[in-house]
Amino acid sequence: MVLCRDFLTWCNETLQTALFKDYAPNGLQVEGREYIGKIVTSVTASRAAIDFAVEQKADLLLVHHGMFWKNELPTVTGWKKERIAALLRHDINMAGYHLPLDAHPTLGNNAQLADRLGFATEKRFGEQNLLNSGSLKQAKTLGALAAHIETVLQRKPVVIGNPEREIRRVAWCSGGAQGFFQTAIDEGVDLYLTGEISEAQYHLANETGTAFISAGHHATERYGVRALAESAAEVFGLEVCHFDENNPA
């Protein structure tokens, strides 16, 4: 067992949370028991994830998407009340790490995604260094790369571009980062990979010749929170369980 505050201090220092301008609080969002020995991870602090943490008798739920965001109504009602009530009823801490967890050079969502897809990271760039660029270890056609991504992430991606086009240089940013497509285009890459697509990206891809893949917000952000928890477990001797949902978004 370890003091929850010591665990949180380690996470905050490891992820350098103070360096980020975020639209969600990073760190403890719902306070539970003082000491923790078992952590459950999840992409999102959903009711299903909370129920799983209760079943596992976890002391802390560690997530990427917490429950509090800027520009939301500052009220605790409905589904939010039910989630928080379940955590408080069982004295479970809930901590969330958003942009700092996307950006960490080894534990972050972008780094972990690159490891799984075989991307060699060469550069971090863009807003708060949230984008990554690099090269494939071996060039692939867009169609072959999309098939590889589907196999690894277990989700069929949305692909915009000529499937026969050779892809060598890629840029990527996990989650809902389709708004950074122009930044990736300016970097001169062959492909931009992120988790979501909006209407405009279809036209940008066709008109600039830079391919675009949307591989799923949830699917591209599974791995950072797991890596963070497993790294903390080695430091503090914690037990870790991972929760996942079949979220198609």
Curated annotation (Swiss-Prot):
A GO cellular-component term linked to this record: cytoplasm
Disulfide bonds: none
Entry keyword set: Metal-binding
GO molecular function, one term: metal ion binding
Residues reported to bind a divalent metal cation 2: 65, 217, 221
Entries under Pfam families matching the protein: DUF34_NIF3
Top-rank taxon: Bacteria
Sequence positions that bind a divalent metal cation 1: 64, 102, 221
PANTHER family cross-referenced by the UniProt entry: GTP CYCLOHYDROLASE 1 TYPE 2 HOMOLOG, NGG1 INTERACTING FACTOR 3
Protein family: Belongs to the GTP cyclohydrolase I type 2/NIF3 family.
Subunit structure as annotated in this protein's UniProt entry: Homohexamer.
Name of this protein: GTP cyclohydrolase 1 type 2 homolog
Species assigned in the record: Neisseria meningitidis serogroup B (strain ATCC BAA-335 / MC58)
